[in-house]
Amino acid sequence: MAKGIVHYEVGEQVDVYLLIKSVTKGIASNGKPFLTLILQDKTGDIEAKLWDVSPEDESVYVPESIVKVLGDIHNYRGKMQLKIRSIRLAHEGDAVRVSDFLETAPMKREDMMEKITEYIFAMQNPNIQRITRYLLKKYEQKFFDYPAATKNHHEFISGLAYHVVSMLELAKALVNLYPSLNRDLLYAGVILHDLGKVIELSGPVSASYTLEGKLLGHIPIMVGEISKAAEHLGISGEEIVVLQHMVLSHHGKAEWGSPKPPMVKEAEILHYIDNLDAKMNMIDRALEKVKPGEFTERIYALENRSFYKPIFSSVLMQERGGTS
């Protein structure tokens, strides 16, 4: 099996096919245009600069294009970067497909669907259960295909559903630890909190923000969807407002995107488990790229910190049959 792009080390030469994940145009100090490419395969992505680009280059090297790249890996300000020596678009004779380069959730779609369905059927409040079932059914295809974000955490195929499954497991453990928590409300909040991203984002590949995503955002979108679902189902009552509050407050603070802070116990828990699972995903994926005894690249979303991979922990994981 060919080595993944994130497993190359500084100084190594690269001669591989990669998928363009995103492209950003810039102007260099000499006044000439350049492109910042984020290139990916199934293992992750890497940044590369394409200097002195022409208008033709800008029209050719676009997201979702497959390219053949020859270059070298180097470290730039604490992050791995691919220095391009030559680049071309892949052609039909190269026999490569976009799906060959897409990172996917480490859990089968049908298994995630089964897990989430179990949690829905564990709900005893009929209003909360019906709204949750209705909305999940309405957006089922996209929910199980979309990433949870464009960057930082769970930004891979089926990342949204995988994020929700992980959060439901955390929620279940906390409900068992704190029996006073409303299980139905917390489970529903977990399932619905990011469902608006199927409208906010453009799709599962090279996701970008839609018009609704830019002007509204996934939080207000889902608050509106809950209201429409309740009206369609003929449901009224306090549950609707509280469920909307769960979604509205899950980012925790106004400066993080929530118009209201959590003011219901389950909303507070939802905020913390969402934050925890997102951060663990960022850290784990960064640690996968380094060897025991090394530090990760700086993680911008985590105050630009690097994380160390202890040697003794890796030995223990291997003894248990896990991965290090």
From Swiss-Prot:
The lineage of its organism: Bacteria, Bacillati, Bacillota, Bacilli, Bacillales. It comes from Geobacillus sp. (strain WCH70). One of its GO terms (molecular function) is nucleic acid binding. Residues 163-279 form the HD domain. Belongs to the YhaM family. It is an enzyme of class 3 (hydrolase). Keywords: Exonuclease, Hydrolase, Nuclease. Shows a 3'-5' exoribonuclease activity. This is 3'-5' exoribonuclease YhaM. One of its GO terms (biological process) is rRNA 3'-end processing.
